[in-house]
Amino acid sequence: MNKTTEYIDALLLSEREKAALPKTDIRAVHQALDAEHRTYSREDDSPQGSVKARLEHAWPDSLAKGQLIKDDEGRDQLQAMPKATRSSMFPDPWRTNPVGRFWDRLRGRDVTPRYVSRLTKEEQASEQKWRTVGTIRRYILLILTLAQTVVATWYMKTILPYQGWALINPMDMVGQDIWVSFMQLLPYMLQTGILILFAVLFCWVSAGFWTALMGFLQLLIGRDKYSISASTVGDEPLNPEHQTALIMPICNEDVSRVFAGLRATWESVKATGNAAHFDVYILSDSYNPDICVAEQKAWMELIAEVQGEGQIFYRRRRRRMKRKSGNIDDFCRRWGNQYSYMVVLDADSVMSGECLSGLVRLMEANPNAGIIQSSPKASGMDTLYARCQQFATRVYGPLFTAGLHFWQLGESHYWGHNAIIRVKPFIEHCALAPLPGEGSFAGSILSHDFVEAALMRRAGWGVWIAYDLPGSYEELPPNLLDELKRDRRWCHGNLMNFRLFLVKGMHPVHRAVFLTGVMSYLSAPLWFMFLALSTALQVVHALTEPQYFLQPRQLFPVWPQWRPELAIALFASTMVLLFLPKLLSIMLIWCKGTKEYGGFWRVTLSLLLEVLFSVLLAPVRMLFHTVFVVSAFLGWEVVWNSPQRDDDSTPWGEAFMRHGSQLLLGLVWAVGMAWLDLRFLFWLAPIVFSLILSPFVSVISSRSTVGLRTKRWKLFLIPEEYSPPQVLVDTDKYLEMNRRRILDDGFMHAVFNPSLNALATAMATARHRASKVLEIARDRHVEQALNETPEKLNRDRRLVLLSDPVTMARLHYRVWNAPERYSSWVNHYQSLVLNPQALQGRTSSAG
C-alpha cells in the first residue's frame, strides 16, 4: 500500500467514492475532490481545494445551511460567527484619589461623567419606594451589627485578665530599664490588639448572622413584595423584538463537560418553544492547541445534533486581552448591538429553558433593571468534599441569598455567571479600564463581576438577585486544593477591587460590597493574628511572675481578674452567631419537608457531619488565605489556570507538600500550649488538631469513592440528586457520550487526519491577503516546524500554525506527500491512537 492509497483510506468516504479517486499522487486526490477544479501555483496548496469535500463527508449534517463561504482570497471558510456590526465600548479612566478630584474641581477641570442617571423623573419616582425601603433596612442592619459588636467587645474587655492600670505604677517606670518597662506594658499591648481584632471579626460575623436571619424569615413567610420574581406571572410570551445571546466564555476547559452542559441547556430552551428568541455564542480563549481542535470538533457535532446552524456560534480569540472580561467586551463590541440581553454562562453552568425564559420575562417587566442574577444551585460532583459543599450551599445558601436580597434589593451582587444583562447599558457603562499605577494591585481588573455591577448601578440601572427563580445550576471544585487555587485568584481580585472604594459616583451599597469582598479574605489573617496574640498573652501570663504588691507597705495584693461567667456567656453568644444560621436552615427544611434531603434523621446527621467538616477545614482555609493576602501585597504572581472541574482526588504527595507546614505548625502549637497550660490547649484544640489532620482530611475528602458511599447512604443528599431535573439528567447523558468520542492530541490529528485538517483549515482565522512578506513568514513557520520533532514545537508556535489556513494545508500535504523526509512527525503520529468514535462521518457504502 503506497502513501496515496493510505491517504484515500483515511478519508471518510464510501468504498465506491474511494475507488473513484486517482491513485497516482496526493495532489491528484485533492484535485479530484475539488468540485471547482481550482489550480494552485504551489503543489502543497492543493489541500485547500478539497477542504469543502472533506468537511461535507465528515460532518454532512453540520453544513446544512451553507456555512461554508469564501474569504477574500477565494479559500473555503467555515462561517462560525455571524457578521460583526461593531459598537463603541470604551472605559473611563479610574480616578481613585478623592484629593485629586477635589483639586480638579477647584481648578474648574471637573468633567461631567457619562454615568449620570438616564432615568426620567417618572421612572425615578417609581423606583423611589424600594430604594427608600432598602436604605432604611441597611441603616437598621448597621445599627444591629454595631450594637451587637459594642456589647460583645465590652464583654471581651471585662474577661481579659489585666483590667485598668492597677498592675502598673507609672511613676516607677520613670527612669527604670526600658526592657522592664516593655515587659510591664506587653500584656496591655497584647490585650489592646486582641480587643481591636475581636471587634472587627465579631462585626463581620454579626453581619452574616443578621443576613441569614432575615433570609430565614423571608423564606419562612414565603411572601416578598419586593422580590423581582413577583413582577411577572411566569407564562407571558416573550417579546419578538428582543433577542437574547447566551454567551459562554471558556479557556482550556474540559471540552466534553462544556458542550454537554451547553447542549442540555439549548435543548431545554427548545423544549419551551422559545428557541427563536435565543442565540448561543461559545467564546473561546483557549491557548492549548489540542483543546482548540477538540472545541472545533465538538462545535461541529453540537450544531449537527441539535440543528443549531445559524443559532449556535463559536469563536476563538487569537489575542487574549483582559481574560474573561475582555472576552465578553469583545463580544459586545462586535455583536452586542444585535441583542437586547445577554446571559453569561460559566463553563460548568447549566440552565433550564424555563429559567432562561423567566430571566428574559423579568427583564421585559422591569425596564430599569440592568442585571438580574439568578441563584445557581451546586450539583453534579461525587467527591466527599464536593458533596459536602453541595449540601452546605444547598441548605445554607438560600438563607444568605434571600438575606442579601432583603438588605440590598435592586442594588445587589452580580457573580459573573448565570445572570442576564441588558446589553446597551453594559456597553455604555461597564467597560473596565486598567487600575492606574504599578505593582500587584494595578493593571487589568481580575474580579470583574462586582465592578461591573457597581458601574451598572452607578449609571442608574438596578442590579437584582432573583433568589427564588429555579433552574440555575453550577458545579463546585472537587477537592480542597482546587478550591484554594480558585480562592487565590478571587483573593487577589477582591483586594484589587478595594482600590475602587473611593471612586466617584459609586453607590454606598457597592462600596460595602467592595469592603465585604476584601473582608472575605482579610478576615483570615485577622483571625490568625487574633489567635497569635491570644497565645502570646497566655505565654506572657504563664511565664511572667506577677507582682501583687506595687506600693511600699501595701496591705492587700492586686490580683489579675478572671470572670469565667462572662467568658462562658461571650463564648456561647459567639457560637450562636456562628451556628444559628445552620440551625435555622435545617429548621426551614424540617418545616417544608425533608424527603428530598434523605429524610429527617439523615438530613440532621448530614448537617452535624457538615458542621464537623467545616470546623476541620476552617483553620486550614485561614492559613491558606493568610498566605494569599500576604502574597498579593508582596506582588507574587497569580497564575490564572482553569479550575479542576472533574472528580479528581488529591495525591498523598501533593497533600503533604501543600499541608506539611500546617501540620508542623499544629504540632508545635499543641506541644507548646500543653507544656505551658493544658487548659488553654483545650480552647485551641479545634484549631491545632485541624491543622495536624489537614493532609489526611484533604486526601480522604477528595476521593469520589468515599463521596459515592455517602451518596448510597443518602448522606449529604440534595434535591437535585433525589429527583434530578431533566436538564441535569441530559447533561450527564451527553457528558458520557462526549467522553466516549473525546479527541486527544488534537493538533497532531489536525495536521495528519484529512477530516480534522479540513476543519482546522476552514476555521483558521488569520486570513490575510497574499503578499511576499507573508509567504516568506509562512514558509519559515512550516519549514521550522517540520525540521524539528513535534515534541520540540512549543504551544505558541503550534497556535500560529493552527491560526493560518495556508500553513495547515501545507503541513498536511507535506507530511503525507513525503513521509520519509518528515519521519519524526510520522513516527510520532503513528504512536498516537485516534479514538474510533471521535469521527463518525458517512456510514453508508456504495451499492
UniProtKB/Swiss-Prot annotation:
Transmembrane spans: 139-156, 194-216, 512-534, 568-590, 603-625, 680-702
Record's protein name: Glucans biosynthesis glucosyltransferase H
CDD domains: Glucan_BSP_MdoH
Gene Ontology biological process terms, A to Z: glucan biosynthetic process
A single MF term (Gene Ontology): hexosyltransferase activity
GO CC field: plasma membrane
SUPFAM superfamilies referenced in this protein's UniProt entry, alphabetically: Nucleotide-diphospho-sugar transferases
Species assigned in the record: Salmonella typhi
Keywords: Cell inner membrane, Cell membrane, Glycosyltransferase, Membrane, Transferase, Transmembrane, Transmembrane helix
Family: Belongs to the glycosyltransferase 2 family. OpgH subfamily.
Cellular location(s): Cell inner membrane
Gene giving rise to this polypeptide: mdoH
